[in-house]
Swiss-Prot record:
UniProt function note: In the hair cortex, hair keratin intermediate filaments are embedded in an interfilamentous matrix, consisting of hair keratin-associated proteins (KRTAP), which are essential for the formation of a rigid and resistant hair shaft through their extensive disulfide bond cross-linking with abundant cysteine residues of hair keratins. The matrix proteins include the high-sulfur and high-glycine-tyrosine keratins.
Protein name as catalogued: Keratin-associated protein 10-8
Quaternary assembly: Interacts with hair keratins.
Region 19 X 5 AA repeats of C-C-X(3), residue ranges: 26-243
One MF term in the entry's GO annotations: identical protein binding
Keyword Iron-sulfur: no
Keywords, alphabetical: Keratin, Repeat
């Protein structure tokens, strides 16, 4: 349709607004063609429904309907498009990646950059500590040979969680002292920390000293040889009596008779 204030004729829709050309360059007033007083007016092509989002072009989130901004100098800039919460059709950056649950922490994931109400935590890496079970070297319920270390026979304490995986605490039982097996000539039983059985004569069990597995074997006291004893005469020593074992030497203490 035509307007008397304009030199040119334009055909516009009924819902179309116009901006007078004299107001272009500053904040334009929205007017109808009949109110334009300048030499010409231009058709405003702004949409009256929802503006096509320009700043909300993310493929992840579906923008909510943007209200049209006032038409300034033929520019239809939508009001700031606030994205709605992420829909199911979001891209990978916003879609929850299946969180593989670890054995020791069911839901210990960290949130993705697209967090808050938008996304579910992304797949988490398990930095869990797994207990390292200690196997006792003792066999049999009656064997008193083994003393457990601080980690005990059930399970070791958790080591601090590392980045890649857990460094197990080395659980080595403290070596124990061989136990004598009665009157057997090979009286020392093997200890797991000693490759061969004790070769010394009848060993008495002793307490474990640090991590060394060395029995303190005390030899039996000296027994006098039959030829050792001579009838008491001419100041000869009487029959030797065994002395108590001092250190590892067993020296007989022979008493002297008066001449």
């Amino acid at each position: 349709m035509a307007d008397a204030c304009c030199t040119r004729t334009y055909v516009i829709a009924a819902s179309t607004m116009s901006v007078c050309s004299s107001d272009v360059g500053h904040v334009s007033r929205v007017s109808s063609p009949s109110t334009c007083t300048g030499s010409s007016w231009q058709v405003d092509n702004c949409q009256e429904s929802c503006c096509e989002p320009r700043s909300c072009a993310s493929s992840c989130c579906t923008p909510s309907c943007c209200a049209p901004a006032p038409c300034l100098a033929l520019v239809c800039a939508p009001v700031s498009c606030e994205p709605s919460p992420c829909q199911s059709g979001c891209t990978d950056s916003c879609t929850p990646s299946c969180c593989q649950q670890s054995s020791c922490q069911p839901a210990c994931c960290t949130s993705s950059p697209c967090q808050q109400a938008c996304c579910v935590p992304v797949c988490c890496k398990s930095n869990c500590c797994k207990p390292v079970c200690c196997v006792s070297i003792c066999s049999g319920a009656s064997s008193p040979c083994c003393q457990q270390s601080s980690c005990q026979s059930a399970c070791c304490t958790f080591s601090p969680c590392q980045q890649a995986c857990c460094v197990p605490i080395c659980c080595k039982p403290i070596c124990c002292v061989p136990v004598c097996s009665g009157a057997s000539s090979l009286c020392c039983q093997k200890s797991s920390c000693q490759p061969a059985c004790c070769t010394t004569s009848c060993c008495r069990p002793s307490s474990s000293v640090s991590l060394l597995c060395r029995p303190v074997c005390r030899p039996a006291c000296c027994v006098p040889v039959p030829s050792c004893c001579v009838p008491a005469s001419s100041c000869q020593p009487s029959c030797c009596h065994p002395a108590s074992c001092l250190s590892f030497l067993c020296r007989p203490a022979c008493s002297r008779l008066a001449c």
